[in-house]
A protein has these predicted regions:
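Broad hydrophobic/π-residue packing in well-ordered secondary structure
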Residues: 7-8, 25-29, 45, 61, ...
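Active-site neighborhood of HAD-like aspartate-dependent phosphohydrolases
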Residues: 1-48
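Metal-dependent phosphoesterase signature
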Residues: 11-31, 56-65, 80-82, 92-99
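Ser/Thr-centric signal marking residues that sit
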Residues: 13, 51, 142
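Substrate-recognition element of Asp-dependent hydrolases with the DxDx(T/V) motif
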Residues: 33, 37-70, 86-93, 135
Length: 176
């Protein structure tokens, strides 16, 4: 049986975007994120972070610094009862033309393979058009967060639409 997941961008989705964040003290999850992640966990979704982190390729911070910043975010989410199950990141600069920087799909394909995911049962949540394009290319449903649509709102949509699709699998919107 294939598994379902919510893939989620990091910056401006789970936490404010601190450009090239290299200090864990600068990492602060949005207030609604820990409880919202827990709701996804409780509903049986894996929660996988997929994030472009070109600061590594630009030499602004190291892999160790990125890991420390991500560990701080995960600690804050865990303190609120939520769990990020895995992190996939692209360390390359845009001009490197790699195959993992969103909207290219390598990070998503790695997640699908590693966890045996069914993309039709998965969601991508992010704040940029490239996040939405990434999810669409993988065959996932998508939710774009913004100043008007919080991560908690996105989770409301996912849980509501998942319940609807279980009752009527042919009634499926792709983007919210």
């Amino acid at each position: 049986m294939s598994r379902r997941a919510v893939l989620v961008d990091r910056d401006d989705t789970l936490c404010p975007d601190v450009p090239y964040c290299s200090d864990p003290a600068d990492m602060h999850a949005f207030p609604d994120v820990p409880a919202s992640v827990k709701r996804l966990n409780d509903a049986g979704y894996l929660v996988l972070m997929v994030t472009n982190q070109s600061g590594i390729g630009r030499g602004y911070f190291t892999l160790e610094q990125l890991n420390a910043v991500n560990a701080e975010l995960l600690s804050q989410i865990s303190a609120g009862g939520g769990r990020i199950d895995d992190i996939f990141f692209c360390p390359h600069r845009p001009e490197d033309n790699c195959d993992c920087r969103k909207p290219k799909t390598r990070m998503g394909l790695q997640a699908i393979e590693k966890y045996g995911l069914d993309p039709a049962e998965c969601w991508m949540v992010g704040d940029h058009d490239k996040d939405i394009e990434f999810g669409r290319q993988l065959g996932m449903r998508t939710v774009k967060v913004s100043a008007e649509t919080s991560f908690s709102d996105a989770v409301d949509t996912i849980l509501s639409e998942s319940a609807k699709s279980q009752n009527n699998p042919n009634n499926r919107e792709e983007t919210y």
